[in-house]
């Protein structure tokens, strides 16, 4: 599939086109919403706070996922992977870094909100910066391991995008999967659920809770859970027994996460919405220039 435009096994012409169009819509929606979020942080002084730095980290990670989806969409519409084996490794690495950073940034936001609402103390800049650096360095570390031999990047069933190779299900993949999943999926999910549950217990009855305490955990579980199930199945059974089309479903679901996150963390936040509106408003920009 990387060298020719022949249809991949298990896919028809319309199915390849449909996957490409879905990826394109997901990429453009996620990229546009998260770019607006990033732009509002850069242009609105009120948003330059330690807590909002964590949201900015998430928006950057989700923008990276959307860019990865855009490359996959373009390749799907071309019906081939035009960037060679090195491009496949780079695409897999970039997608894995941003996916892990998105998951861990969501957990960091949950912890930051718990700190803000339940301890009634402001998150310090050095704590927020250290947390963001840890998220990205940790994500880069885990994403680099398949390039070094623990795990491996390869083409997805459609052959027009690259991800962690789960087709063999051997000891190398199994050991990497369980170790990586514990630190980058199970722990962030636990932190997210615990943080919002404690917030709900402490502030839910008082009516002072101003954030959605269920959507973030559901997004992590439903957005990335299908990948976890697919990978787990590859460990315990022959993954080729699953149709190639069904194997592509987790990738399509995961590419929706940036849009959902932008709606929840940015458009669902009154201050961020105001910042986006100020950036888009010609009158506001004119006032800023005359100050």
UniProtKB/Swiss-Prot annotation:
Record topological domains on the Extracellular side: 1-15, 74-91, 152-175, 241-247
Q: Which disease is it linked to?
A: Retinitis pigmentosa 44: A retinal dystrophy belonging to the group of pigmentary retinopathies. Retinitis pigmentosa is characterized by retinal pigment deposits visible on fundus examination and primary loss of rod photoreceptor cells followed by secondary loss of cone photoreceptors. Patients typically have night vision blindness and loss of midperipheral visual field. As their condition progresses, they lose their far peripheral visual field and eventually central vision as well.
Where, by residue number, does the polypeptide cross the bilayer? 16-36, 53-73, 92-112, 131-151, 176-196, 220-240, 248-268
Q: Which residues carry this modification: N6-(retinylidene)lysine?
A: 255
Q: Write out the GO MF terms.
A: G protein-coupled photoreceptor activity; G protein-coupled receptor activity
InterPro entries the UniProt entry points to: GPCR_opsins, GPCR_Rhodpsn, GPCR_Rhodpsn_7TM, Retinal_BS, RPE_GPCR
What are the leading ranks of the lineage? Answer: Eukaryota, Metazoa, Chordata, Craniata, Vertebrata
One of the GO biological process terms: G protein-coupled receptor signaling pathway
Q: Where in the cell is it found?
A: Membrane
Protein name, as recorded: RPE-retinal G protein-coupled receptor
Pfam families of this UniProt entry?
Answer: 7tm_1
User: Keywords for this entry?
Assistant: Chromophore, Disease variant, Disulfide bond, G-protein coupled receptor, Glycoprotein, Membrane, Photoreceptor protein, Receptor, Retinal protein, Retinitis pigmentosa, Sensory transduction, Transducer, Transmembrane, Transmembrane helix, Vision
Naturally occurring in which organism (per UniProt): Homo sapiens
What does this protein's UniProt record list under function? Receptor for all-trans- and 11-cis-retinal. Binds preferentially to the former and may catalyze the isomerization of the chromophore by a retinochrome-like mechanism.
Q: Topologically, how does it sit relative to the membrane?
A: Multi-pass membrane protein
**Top-rank taxon, per record:** Eukaryota
The main location class comes to: membrane
- Glycosylation is annotated at 172
Question: Which cellular components does GO assign to this protein?
Answer: plasma membrane
Q: Is the keyword Kinase in the record?
A: no
**Cytoplasmic face residues:** 37-52, 113-130, 197-219, 269-291
Would you identify the family this protein belongs to, as annotated?
Belongs to the G-protein coupled receptor 1 family. Opsin subfamily.
Q: Does this entry carry the keyword Nucleotide-binding? A: no
Processing and modification events after translation: Covalently binds all-trans- and 11-cis-retinal.
Q: List S-S links within the chain.
A: 88-162
| Tissue expression notes | Preferentially expressed at high levels in the retinal pigment epithelium (RPE) and Mueller cells of the neural retina.
């Amino acid at each position: 599939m990387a060298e020719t435009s022949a249809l991949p096994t298990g896919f028809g012409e319309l199915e390849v086109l449909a996957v490409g169009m879905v990826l394109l819509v997901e990429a453009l929606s996620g990229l546009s919403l998260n770019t607006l979020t990033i732009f509002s942080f850069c242009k609105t002084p009120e948003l330059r706070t330690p807590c909002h730095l964590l949201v900015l980290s998430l928006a950057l990670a989700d923008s990276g996922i959307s860019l990865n989806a855009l490359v996959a969409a373009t390749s799907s519409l071309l019906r081939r992977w035009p960037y060679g084996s090195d491009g496949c490794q780079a695409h897999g690495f970039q997608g894995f870094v941003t996916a892990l950073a998105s998951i861990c940034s969501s957990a960091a936001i949950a912890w930051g909100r718990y700190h803000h609402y339940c301890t009634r103390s402001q998150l310090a800049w050095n704590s927020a910066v250290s947390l963001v650096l840890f998220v990205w360095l940790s994500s880069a570390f885990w994403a680099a391991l398949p390039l070094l031999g623990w795990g491996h990047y390869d083409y997805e069933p459609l052959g027009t995008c690259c991800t962690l190779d789960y087709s063999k299900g051997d000891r190398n993949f199994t050991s990497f999967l369980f170790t990586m999943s514990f630190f980058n999926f199970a722990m962030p999910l636990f932190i997210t659920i615990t943080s919002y549950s404690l917030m709900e217990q402490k502030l839910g009855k008082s009516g002072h809770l101003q954030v959605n305490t269920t959507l973030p955990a559901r997004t992590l579980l439903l957005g990335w859970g299908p990948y976890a199930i697919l990978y787990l199945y590859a460990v315990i059974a022959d993954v080729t027994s699953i149709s190639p089309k069904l194997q592509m479903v987790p990738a399509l679901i995961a590419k929706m996460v940036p849009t959902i996150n932008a709606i929840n963390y940015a458009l669902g936040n009154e201050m961020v919405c105001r910042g986006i509106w100020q950036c888009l408003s010609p009158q506001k920009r004119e006032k800023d220039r005359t100050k």
